[in-house]
Amino acid sequence: MHALRALDTLCENMEYNFRALEEKWAPIWERDRLFEVDENDSETPRKYVLDMFSYPSGDLHMGHAETYAYGDFIARYWRHRGYNVLHPVGWDSFGLPAENAAIKHGSDPKVWTYRNIDQQARSMRLYAASFDWSRRLHTSDPEYYRWNQWLFLKLYKHGLAYRKKAWVNWDPSDRTVLANEQVLPDGTSERSGALVVKKKLTQWFLRITAYADRLLDDLSMLENNWPERVITMQRNWIGRSEGVSIEFNIPTLKRPVMVFTTRPETIFGVTYLALAFDSEVTEELASKSGVLGELLELRHNIDKTHESVRGLDLKSFAIHPLTGQSIPIFAASYILSDYAKGAVMSVPGHDTRDERFAVRYNLPIVKIMEDNRLISSGKYSGQSVTQARENITRDLCAKSLGRREISYRLRDWLISRQRYWGTPIPILYDSNGSEIPVEEDDLPVLLPDSEGIDLTPSGLSPLGGIHDWVNLHKAGSLFRRDTDTMDTFFDSSWYFLRYLNPDCDTAPFTLEKAKKWGPVDQYCGGVEHAVLHLLYARFITKFLYDIGFVDFKEPFLRLINQGMVVLNGAKMSKSKGNIVEFSKEVSQHGVDVIRFALIFSGPPEEDIDWKDVSMTGAARFLSRCIQTAKEVPKRTADLSLGDIELRKHTHSLLNDIDWLVDSYRFNVIAARLMDLLNITRKKIQTIGADNPAIREAIETIAIALDMFSPYTAEEMWEILGNKYSVSKALFPEVDTTFLEQKTTCAIVQIDGRLRGRLNVLTNITTEQLVHSARSLPAIEHALSGRSVKRVICVPPKLVNFVVEPK
């Protein structure tokens, strides 16, 4: 049996002992604190690689396994390229799930949270993610949320945090308000799934709209580095629209209503005005016309059904600014009070929603466009749409009946939450109800222990019931604390900066460290955060830039979104009973097998169906890697004498790794490693394991494999007799001669008879060709015990060994 086949049989019959490797190397890596960055190293170039931090809702799941596999792949890649890599870890540990679990089980949300953090931390360490654990943070630690409060006060000082009474999104299940970004298109809560209703409450907002243009314009800085769909989602969410605000007089109010439109050319098709159910003008008109009770009842029912074409005749009229005609005014369920002034000039002849509403309420439908030209539009008839748009706008502005405006879909960020487990808002109120910011020296405003607090959602903040905490006597006066807590997306809007100075107690981070490490070079996480976390982080970064705390305008230079891990095509969930348990899979298959199999399954952005993930194939490959490393001698001849064909394959892979990583084609690298191993094993059969090209190939595989399966790679590296650790090894430099030069087939003879062939470079030297020919196992065997009288060498075509007769 050939040696190669024997080795293959051995590998397939051997169990891949992943547990032994994990038990061997995990404590060594932890002991040596292998992945802590050297802050004193000012010479080595730096990279900051970050995974979106985890919420501690239980043990890790397969979604975590996928995300951390990709993030760790990139961090290890940059280390192998000679960079000092910051790759920190932490937990987004405030939030509703902990509070709801505490209510359900009668426990403390703090205890529940930190128990889950400990469990996840153990799993993360086993998973061999190369984190710098010295920078670990939890957003529920006072040492962290102190700086949440500091940041809030900075925003308040600059007029970007304010409190007002407004219609807000109310989650009736979690009994707290939601930001617009947390309400799904179907009107349900992004977290609880409950139908969201509207409530009028006094709440805290952040003026993100002040940054709308910059948030939109600076997306151009991220093109080709962020997924296009994320950029598109943010662009659409910000929703910049250029148009005209047109004045419609309402005689019963004795004042006009301003209506924003992007299509002023349709003004002659207006047959009614539609107002938002919850606007003040709507209530005022309903009250004057005696239909306020109907409005309130209808609004309440609409909140429950989310019906899109319900309305109410307000029995009032507006005056058309150009024709002078009276136009009926309706309250309409499809009009948003917080967008474009909460009023729409309705053109049912050219808008499908307006048309449905007009049909339902028997309102006129007028066509004013035909073949892209205006009709029935007075002096503007016959003009093209573009001409009429400009001319009507100009005339309205000239008559002071309109003005050019830019409107945004983006609304200010509502951050008040009527729940316990979050950052207290650092504001006091005096006896007159005036707002007084807490002094920075008095931070943090500590969250009181939950013992004795009724956490059951009531619509009121649980903190309001702790009178000793709420009421504060200071300088002879009585003050009352704000009892709401902050949206936890505030916590995550700047956490990547706290990693730079996690132990600093004089500032959240320093400008020096921000300049040194920021911004994040590579960010890894799910697309579900496109218009939540990612937008908020961009806003806060721009604010910090404005006040001189960072010197960059965007937080994350590059972004990779991974797909979901599904089972039989369905999203995993506890309710469906189709959860694949992380700990069970790791126990059964091992970390390295899972990591390699996940990455090999396809491009990161695509969903992975767990049933299609090949554990057996991954385990077989890793076993062969270790067994092949054992075949390679500790010392080999000069590399220049290595097999040319194998070196071409090795250097082709080395040459392609950079662009494959840059384009996130990690699965292609996995396939190339498997190919290189197969080629190497076949070469062992023909040229022997002691050929220096064999060692070069296996060392290259070990270094590259560290990005996938670090336990196996570290074991291979030790077997090969190299200096610990493989994670510090650099990729060999690419020898471009193997990429550019042509090869040819050289004939190897003994006494003029063909005994073998070699694939060699056309510029191979006589010495190299003779050495390579002698290294062929068939030639080595034939010349054993015989004296070579003469060597005839004609590079690159021929080597003939002339031997003494037996």
From Swiss-Prot:
Localization annotation: Cytoplasm
Catalytic activity: tRNA(Leu) + L-leucine + ATP = L-leucyl-tRNA(Leu) + AMP + diphosphate
Record PROSITE patterns: AA_TRNA_LIGASE_I (PS00178)
Enzyme class, UniProt record, top EC level: ligase
Motif ('HIGH' region): 54-64
Binding-site residues for ATP, renumbered to this chain: K574
Record-linked SUPFAM superfamilies: Anticodon-binding domain of a subclass of class I aminoacyl-tRNA synthetases, Nucleotidylyl transferase, ValRS/IleRS/LeuRS editing domain
Keyword field: Aminoacyl-tRNA synthetase, ATP-binding, Cytoplasm, Ligase, Nucleotide-binding, Protein biosynthesis
Motif ('KMSKS' region): 571-575
One Gene Ontology MF term: leucine-tRNA ligase activity
Signal peptide region: none
UniProt superkingdom: Bacteria
E.C. number(s) listed in UniProt: 6.1.1.4
Gene Ontology CC entries for this record: cytoplasm
GO process terms (BP): leucyl-tRNA aminoacylation
Main location (coarse class): cytoplasm
Similarity field: Belongs to the class-I aminoacyl-tRNA synthetase family.
UniProt protein name: Leucine--tRNA ligase
